[in-house]
Amino acid sequence: MDKTLSREEAKQLMQLLCLDMSCWGNLPLMRRQYLVKCKEYHPDKGGNEESMKLLNSLYLKLQDSVSSVHDLNEEEDNIWQSSQIPTYGTPDWDEWWSQFNTYWEEELRCNESMPSSPKRSAPEEEPSCSQATPPKKKHAFDASLEFPKELLEFVSHAVFSNKCITCFVVHTTREKGEVLYKKLLQKYQCSFISKHAFYNTVLIFFLTPHKHRVSAINNFCKGHCTVSFLFCKGVNNPYGLYSRMCRQPFNLCEENIPGGLKENEFNPEDLFGEPKEPSLSWNQIANFALEFDIDDVYYLLGSYIRFATKPEECEKCSKNDDATHKRVHVQNHENAVLLQESKSQKNACTQAIDRVIAERRYNCVTLTRKKLLTKRFKKLFNEMDKIVVGERKILLYMASIAWYTGLNKKIDELVVRFLKLIVDNKPKHRYWLFKGPINSGKTTLATALLNLCGGKALNINIPSEKLPFELGVALDQYMVVFEDVKGQIGIEKHLPSGNGVNNLDNLRDYLDGCVEVNLEKKHVNKRSQIFPPGIVTMNEYCIPETVAVRFEKTVMFTIKRNLRESLEKTPQLLSQRILHSGIAMLLLLIWYRPVSDFDEEIQSNVVYWKEVLDNYIGLTEFATMQMNVTNGKNILEKWFE
């Protein structure tokens, strides 16, 4: 032990182990105390990191030194065999003795000379009958020092793993191998188990019907191997390992299935465990949300849970009215059943909404505004395939076009000019003002344009300290509408006053679009972006010049009695929200504008819908609708009684 560590290092190690120096050299005691102190000093257990590092370095150095000393002693002991030692007292023995001493360290040699003593006369010398103690015999190979190298390619080398598997191999002594073979077979009801001899040790290979951690198997075996060595490994290649252990230097001792393990006799679940139960696919939910652009957690959850109903029992699927619903229902039925039973329903839907927001953010950054508008029109065309079905629906939408024509004779030119404004998004030329008295059609037209392009309506009649979160709603939106902005009392004394116009005056950077502004939402970091363009609607309030100059165009609205009367007599346009829909505005453009005005990607859709509209209504019928609007009658009086 004196050759292992220096005196100072030995003292440090014993102090860290909290042992007296009298215990120095008691390796089993030091080993037990080392394991205890590892738990005490480990940083994850609240210990001292420096003490842990010092303890590990000293103890590992001690282990390495002890091993090297043992190896040196064995080499020294095995230099000479007993049969090679000559008879003591002969010249051969003197020569052997001189050669033997050359292997000793220099500090053990003595070069002193002793004074000669007078020789005593003696009778005849008798040959000595004594012999030197022969060196120790060379030890046989000890297979317990490490796991067989021949098997390393077939086993897992993970030190700490929570992975559960079904195939293991245990390496221990012959005596414990007999015990563990029976214990493991009884404990885990092994589907296959075999015992193999390896020099003076035993390897036990076994397959379990259920999955277990390697640590669980190891802990069970340790209960029967308190002194004997033990190696427990998970197996990555079961048949390859078994096949190798049936060849030299291994010997098959016994196995519970005659004939052993055959490569083709076992099913994959026998080797790798029971087939994994289907789990909820969050990605499939996210794909559904992306396809239908759903950004509401609870709406997504409610929509997806309904797919848990069997497709053959679904009313929508049985009617065959919506092919898209049937396709989506069949694709998502199994996953919806799993979602229905899941305890993380909201988490899965929240992640799906995050995917939708991320996709929207990516499109806003990478696509041009023209591409974004084209993509929006494509989405509306897909909705039209489901909604605008049958003569009644088409007539209702054509009635809405007739009503908008009564609102403004050049409504199509107005919409096209607005779309150009939104697409170009030029600084200081990004907003229109819709101004007029109550019930003059401002909000109706603004909402239809908002639904046509996609965006959000904002209320800025709130206190200024609440504005940041209201403006944060505009994150990643194509356009916005500042709805019903209130200001100071002007000519119309009956109008209520509010903070809207004053707040607009403080949002010049937002309206101009020259610089990026910071937008924020709750639980989301601020993000800088150009505030989206849009529309401001208000009644007849006074507008300061600093705000008025930021509107590219002001559209004045007036009350038209015939429009109100025709709506009252055609209530379906309001009850079914047809007037406010983006589909009505898109059909208006299809009805009035030539195909060449549309993007090439959607011109085929425009041609199709022009043909559909021509099949159901001609110019004469549409003129009749316009006449009914002008006279304040039911717009569909000729068609619906």
From Swiss-Prot:
Signal peptide: none
Enzyme Commission code(s) on record: 5.6.2.4
GO biological process: DNA replication; symbiont-mediated perturbation of host cell cycle G1/S transition checkpoint; symbiont-mediated suppression of host innate immune response; symbiont-mediated suppression of host JAK-STAT cascade via inhibition of JAK1 activity; symbiont-mediated suppression of host type I interferon-mediated signaling pathway
Residue ranges for the DNA-binding region feature of this UniProt entry: 148-263
Classification via SUPFAM superfamilies: Chaperone J-domain (SSF46565), Origin of replication-binding domain, RBD-like (SSF55464), P-loop containing nucleoside triphosphate hydrolases (SSF52540)
InterPro entries, alphabetized: DnaJ_domain, Helicase_SF3_DNA-vir, J_dom_sf, Lg_T_Ag_polyomavir, Lg_T_Ag_Polyomavir_C, P-loop_NTPase, T_Ag_DNA-bd, Znf_lg_T-Ag_D1-typ
Region (Disordered): 114-136
Catalytic activity from the UniProt record: Couples ATP hydrolysis with the unwinding of duplex DNA by translocating in the 3'-5' direction; ATP + H2O = ADP + phosphate + H(+)
Cofactor annotation remark: DNA helicase activity requires Mg(2+).
Cofactor(s) the protein requires to work: Mg(2+)
PTM: Phosphorylated on both serine and threonine residues. Small t antigen inhibits the dephosphorylation by the AC form of PP2A. O-Glycosylated near the C-terminal region.
One GO cellular component term: host cell nucleus
Keywords associated with the record: Acetylation, ATP-binding, DNA replication, DNA-binding, Early protein, G1/S host cell cycle checkpoint dysregulation by virus, Helicase, Host nucleus, Host-virus interaction, Hydrolase, Inhibition of host innate immune response by virus, Inhibition of host interferon signaling pathway by virus, Inhibition of host JAK1 by virus, Interferon antiviral system evasion, Isomerase, Magnesium, Metal-binding, Modulation of host cell cycle by virus, Nucleotide-binding, Oncogene, Phosphoprotein, Viral immunoevasion, Zinc, Zinc-finger
Residues holding ATP: G436, P437, I438, N439, S440, G441, K442, T443
Zinc fingers typed T-ag D1-type, residue spans: 277-369
Main location: host cell
Domain comment, as recorded: The J domain is essential for multiple viral activities, including virion assembly, viral DNA replication, transformation and transcriptional activation. The LXCXE motif specifically binds to host pRB, RBL1, and RBL2.
Subunit structure: Forms homohexamers in the presence of ATP. Interacts with host HDAC1. Interacts (via LXCXE domain) with host RB1; the interaction induces the aberrant dissociation of RB1-E2F1 complex thereby disrupting RB1's activity. Interacts (via LXCXE domain) with host pRB-related proteins RBL1 and RBL2. Interacts (via C-terminus) with host TOP1 and POLA1 allowing DNA replication. Interacts with host TP53, inhibiting TP53 binding to DNA. Interacts with host preinitiation complex components TBP, TFIIA and TFIID to regulate transcription initiation.
Name under which the protein is recorded: Large T antigen
